[in-house]
Amino acid sequence: MLCTVIDIRGDYAFVKYQDTGVVSEVAIALLPFGIDVGDKLKFENYEFERV
């Protein structure tokens, strides 16, 4: 499932899933190091990977 980081607030990032349009709050610790607003991610097997 593909998503985009739309905002970062403190220890949390807000990601918007492309297929559903749902916005979710995700702990920064679960995301790849150096993540920034606008980055595209793939969520698969309960892990996020930068694409």
Short names for language-model regions:
Residues 1-8:
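Structural detector for short beta-strands of small beta-barrel domains
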Residues 46-51:
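Short, Lys/Arg- and Gly-enriched loop/turn segments at beta-strand edges
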